[in-house]
Amino acid sequence: MKSKKVILDTSAILTYFEGEEGKETVEKLMIRSTSEKIELFIPFSAAIEFYYINFNLQGEETANQRFAMLMSLPVEVLKNIDEPYMIQAGRLKASYPISFADALIAAYVYLENASLVHKDPEYLTLEKEINLITLPLKKKLV
């Protein structure tokens, strides 16, 4: 039986590390990935975003420590950026109000027929294109 594919967005990774609402969902997915019920992935662009966000907010040492922790989790980093992924990312970026990094991540989700775990409102515009597992969105302070 083929495993279900699940991709973590940067926001889901940060939710896990920061202990934000929705962390339990990410933890459960990690547990399921160790029993081979699902395949859990992180796109390279999400790993890069995770690193530089930690670097900017907490410094290089913490960024390095957290990145090492990320790489030790039961997830596989998606490094493929072949032509189909480039074209799909370009199509999504041209068609929807999303960032370049989100277009790359969404292209993986689309082409791998995966589900995306996130808490980024930008992805909600893609709900007809990709499968979404939306974590509780952060409330905006007025």
Segments the model singles out, each with a brief description of its role:
Residues 1-42, 55-68, 140-142:
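Short, well-structured N-terminal submotif of metal-dependent ribonuclease cores
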Residues 13-14, 47, 123-124:
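A generic structural signal for short hydrophobic patches within well-formed alpha-helices
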Residues 35-37, 73, 112, 129:
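Structured helix-beta-strand junction loops
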Residues 76-119:
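Active-site neighborhoods of divalent-metal-dependent phosphate/nucleic-acid chemistry enzymes
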